[in-house]
Amino acid sequence: MSEIIYTVVLIVLGLPMLLSIINYRPFFDWLQNSDLESWHETLPALINDRLDERRWGDMPGWLAALESLPDISVQYYDFSVGVTVGDATDITNEVRDQLQQSLMGLHPWRKGPFELFGLPIDTEWRSDWKWERVLPHLQPLKNRLILDVGCGNGYHCWRMLGAGAKRVIGIDPSAKFVFQFNAIKKYVGAEQPIDIL
C-alpha cells in the first residue's frame, strides 16, 4: 500500500523526477507508525491536490530551480543559532554561482535568514529576530512533536528542530514555500525529522 501512495503522489503531479526532489517517503513511513497513523491514508491525496501543477503556474520554474541545485556533500549544518548549512570552503566559486542562480529561481524568499555554504539567502523578513523574542516564552521543545501552521518556508521549523524537537511538521497554503523548504532539505537529507506539507 505504501508504494502505491508514493507513486500516486508522483503520477498526479505528472513529474517522476519529483521523488528525488521532494521526498515524503521518510515522513509517510514515520506517519504510518505514529499516533497520527489515521492521516496516512488521507494525507497523500491532500498533498497531491495542493501540489497539483495546474494550480501553480510558476511550478515548472520552481521545479527547474530545485533540479538545478548542485549536488554538494554537506559536512556541517546547524539550526540552533540560525539556519546554516555547509561552509564556504566546501564549494568552488563555480558551484557557488550555480547554487546562487538556482536559489534565485525560488525568489523572493520571505522568511529567513538562511545561509548555504557561506552564501546568504536574501529574505524579506528577519525571522531570526522573531525567534529570539518568542523563544524565552516557549516551553522546552526537546523531544516534542510540533505542528507549525502557517510555517511559510520553514525557517522556524528548522529552528525548532535545532532546539531539540523530535519531529516538526509545517503546513502552509503556498506551494512555493514547499519548494524553498526542500531547497534547504536537499542538503541536510530526507531522513531529517522535518517536513512541510
Give the residues covered by each predicted segment:
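N-terminal accessory regions of S-adenosyl-L-methionine
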Residues: 14-127, 186-187
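Conserved alpha-helix/loop element of class I SAM-dependent methyltransferases that forms part
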Residues: 125-142
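Conserved class I S-adenosyl-L-methionine
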Residues: 144-152
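Conserved SAM-binding loop of SAM-dependent methyltransferases across substrates and taxa
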Residues: 153-164
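Short beta-strand element of Class I
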Residues: 166-171
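Conserved SAM/SAH-binding beta-strand->alpha-helix loop
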Residues: 174
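Conserved SAM-binding loop
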Residues: 181-182
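S-adenosyl-L-methionine
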Residues: 185-197
